[in-house]
Amino acid sequence: MPFYENRSVRTYYEETGSGFPLLVLPGGGLSGTLASLATPFNPMERLKDDFRCIAADRRNAPSGQSTGPLESGRPWDSFADDHLGLMDHLGIQRFGVIGFCISGPMILNLIKNAPERVVAAAMMQPSGYRPELPDLFYQNNMKEWGPALCEARADVTMEMVDAFLTSMYTDRTGFVFSVDRDFVRSCPAPLLIAPDDVPSHPYKMAMEVADLAPDSEVTIYPWKDTPEHIDEVVEHARRFLKAHVPVNA
């Protein structure tokens, strides 16, 4: 089982396929692991014929194998560190990204941290702020992720979880938590957005990102309602990501 280690962070990852590198970020919120990629579709299976697909368990997902400190002062950047560090470990300089749910905000922050490295990104059912449920992510994670992490890790307390979630969500309300609207207006990477509309995946916020970004595409909506629609979105993602592979790759 492959692990990448960087100081106190240990990341479990897998890769499959061949071609231009594609970083695959699971949904499942802070509990996201490789197993979370099973639905609505698994890029590790569906895109492996066109890309070298690389995915990892999220740091501190209770059921996963990736561990590290809770960096409450820089929650989103700590995940970007993990993603970029893994690419460095594998000797990959430039890559595409596809991700689900919480990975939408993570992708935008990844582009902010390494604009020269991300050639294109597909944000599937991205999460974002919903004004009628302003504390949704804090409350859900205090109820589920936090206690499960504390049970798995004797060095983590609910006070630490509270500080992390407050910094990650409560102090960053109003948009997508990880970046502001000005960044999206100048986002250097092409974006593909597949909107959803459940409490944690607000349609309005996904479409605002698409409207603000200077180079964006939007898939059909709804798309998770039938296998045929899922297939259509998978093919859209494949075309989009392939279209932005550098010619000298």
Feature-to-residue mapping (PLM):
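Conserved HGGG/HGGXW glycine-rich cap/lid loop of the alpha/beta-hydrolase fold
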Residues: 7-66
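Active-site loop/oxyanion-hole signature of alpha/beta-hydrolase fold enzymes
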Residues: 42-45, 55-95
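Short beta-to-alpha linker loops that shape the active-site pocket of alpha/beta-hydrolase fold enzymes
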Residues: 57-61, 127, 222-224
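Conserved hydrolase catalytic core segment
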Residues: 93-129
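Hydrophobic, aromatic-rich cap/lid helix
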Residues: 154-180, 187
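Short beta-strand/loop motif that positions the catalytic acidic residue
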Residues: 187, 193-195
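Conserved alpha/beta-hydrolase "acid-adjacent" motif
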Residues: 199-205
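Catalytic active-site module of serine/aspartate enzymes centered on a nucleophile-bearing elbow/loop
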Residues: 216-249
